[in-house]
Amino acid sequence: MARDISDLTPIEGAQTLIDYIAAGSKPKERWRLGTEHEKFPFYTDGNMPVPYDGPRGIKALLEGMQMMLGWEPILDAGNIIGLVEPTGAGAISLEPGGQFELSGAPLETIHQTCREANAHLAQLREIAEPLGIKFLGIGGSPKWTLAETPRMPKTRYGIMSSYMPKVGTRGLDMMYRTCTI
């Protein structure tokens, strides 16, 4: 989940950049790992992507996860677009094409991140399977065209969708048809 920060201080040379980076460093005992795990939801009856609305849509999936986990909803223009763990130990968000993303808690070891991702997937399955939804953890959409890919109701994605075609030919595919793992 993006947590955008703006700093308009100009970089005036190599030392300014070095100092800026060094100011953000932490002692080794405070180093942490954070998982970003995206996956494509799809319907098992027809292998099509899952739209936002409807009784078996992304919104229903997020609402089910909210009830199960007790996490706080993230809203955009009244639409639930994610969940955040109340103490800041992780979040679930939506990417532009409905890619479901776990933004994990800051953890000490790769083994902890593995357990966190596995627990997330088990929780997700518990809500998704009754809806006829499964997930693909794969870098690119295997079969759905851009036109077949649903659009999530997140304000900034509308802005980005208008901008991307002006700066390249594959920006919309990157937004809607890719996942990170």
PLM region descriptions:
Residues 1-169, 177:
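Terminal catalytic/cofactor-binding subdomain
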